[in-house]
Every structure is written in C-alpha cells, then in structure tokens.
Amino acid sequence: MKTGRIIKSISGVYRVDVDGEMYDTKPRGLFRKNKFSPIVGDVVDFEVENVTEGYIHHVHERKNEIKRPPVSNVDHLIIVMSAVEPDFSTQLLDRFLVIAHSYHMRPRILVTKKDLTSLEKQHDIEKLLEVYENMSYKTQFISINEDIEQVFSSWGDGLAVLSGQSGVGKSTLLNKYFPNIEIETQHISKALNRGRHTTRHVELFERAKGFIADTPGFSALDYDHIQKDEIKNYFMEIHEYGATCKFRDCNHINEPKCNVKAELENGNIAQFRYDHYLQLFKEISNRKERY
C-alpha cells in the first residue's frame, strides 16, 4: 500500500503523486456505494496493481475543502488584489481573509499592477498594507517584471490556491509561472471543438516547496458555512482584544464593557476594519436559512 496526494482527476481516474512518482488510480466500488468521490488535493492510500496503476482504498480526513473549484487540504490562500483596474479594496480583502480563516488556511495578500499605479496611490496602498502587516499578515506588492519564481517560492511549504475577483491578474500569474498551461489548454479546446468557455479540470503543479492549483481560484464569496457569532474570530485584532471583554458572548456592537470598542477608541483597531466587521455581521444576521 502506498500513500500520496491526488494532483489531477479526469473521468474517474485519479493521478496520485508519491514523492514525484505518478500513479493513475481508480476508487474501489465502496466509494460509489457511499456516494463519496475523491477530489484533487486528497491524501489517499492505494494499492498498486502494476507499475503505474492502482486502486484507492482510503481517503485521509480532509483538513479543509473548497467547493469551487473542488480542492482539499489547502495550506495557503493567496488573496490576489490589484492596485488598479479593479481598484484595491480593503472591504473585499477583509472578506477573503474571513473565508481563509474559516477554512483554516493561511492567507497571504498579493497586490498586483504596481507598475500601472501612480506613486501617490502606491504610497496609499502601502500604508493600508502596513495595517495588515501589523497583524502579522504577509503581504507582497508586485509589478509585471517581478521575479515570479521568487514570488511563488516565498509562500512556504504546502498547497497554495489563488483567490480574488476577476481582472486582478490571477491567470497572468499562473501563465507566467507555468508558460505552457495556456498553450495546452487552447490546444485541447480547439481539438475538442469547444468554445472559449471550456471547463478546466483542476490540476496541481509542483512549485518550490509545494504545489499550486492551476485554476485561477475562486472569486465568489460564500459564507453559508459561517454563523454570525463566528465572524469575530476571523478578524484577528477583534478576536485578540475581544478575549478581555466583560462578557464571553460579546459581539462588540452594543454590549457594555466591550474591550474591542475601547481599543477602537484608542486607535488600536482600524476604523475601516471594524466597519467591515459590522457589515459582514449584519449580512449574515439577516440572511435567510436555506433548507
């Protein structure tokens, strides 16, 4: 029995990487019976049938799972924001940070298009990034000429997935790091006589110190798995200062003897961060339950 990570899935065949050796595997019938399918990122135990093929017997417990695209066991969520077109948004950034923490992923903030930004706006963005750096978030502000190898290798060990809204440069980053992915995709689409909206299969590729998914990541923010009382745990400074509030169930809104409100008044919590917390708390409080 061998253990490896699924790096690719096509038509019920799962390619498993075991220390650089590849095996094309299929799940045992028990998986179909239980209506459970392995996904890219899963760590699996499989039995080798011949030199390069085998059957999956067991899928290890997932530490997290992204639905769109379906990827499991993600270590790093690279939140890609652009300086311009679209403009840098702390509100959107904070929402992606909440998603990252809710799935127990380590977030990193990557801002693109520095070369297209005025010096004044660069300074404004750098001042905002300092707020996040003071909370121990890792940040990068890059231009088109950046050393892409160094950018990707700085993320540390494990599986990284890019996230961010359309137009921020996720696909550009991936195609620069893997220059043959786009060519291969176009070739396959043309061969299958499909349009430009051909669905891509998720695949993991090796990078320095780990893997990265070749998908441009997810851009839709889904909070269905988050309850309103959990949001305070995903704003790092609010979680930290909230530990000394008078009441353990304090949501830091109108409650008495709230340490978060006191630290906000003292300037230790950025007003825009607190405002974004309130907005998200209200949204989740007002959502209709799905049945």
Curated annotation (Swiss-Prot):
Residue positions binding Zn(2+): C245, C250, H252, C258
Cellular component terms per the entry's GO annotation: cytoplasm
Documented EC number(s): 3.6.1.-
GO MF, one annotated term: metal ion binding
Localization, UniProt: Cytoplasm
Gene3D superfamilies: Nucleic acid-binding proteins (2.40.50.140), P-loop containing nucleotide triphosphate hydrolases (3.40.50.300), Probable gtpase engc, domain 3 (1.10.40.50)
GTP-binding recorded as keyword: yes
GO terms (BP aspect): ribosomal small subunit biogenesis
Limits of the CP-type G domain: 63-221
Required co-factors: Zn(2+)
Keyword set, alphabetical order: Cytoplasm, GTP-binding, Hydrolase, Metal-binding, Nucleotide-binding, Ribosome biogenesis, RNA-binding, rRNA-binding, Zinc
Function of the protein: One of several proteins that assist in the late maturation steps of the functional core of the 30S ribosomal subunit. Helps release RbfA from mature subunits. May play a role in the assembly of ribosomal proteins into the subunit. Circularly permuted GTPase that catalyzes slow GTP hydrolysis, GTPase activity is stimulated by the 30S ribosomal subunit.
Record-stated family: Belongs to the TRAFAC class YlqF/YawG GTPase family. RsgA subfamily.
Name listed for the protein in its UniProt record: Small ribosomal subunit biogenesis GTPase RsgA
Taxonomic source organism: Staphylococcus saprophyticus subsp. saprophyticus (strain ATCC 15305 / DSM 20229 / NCIMB 8711 / NCTC 7292 / S-41)
Gene for this chain: rsgA
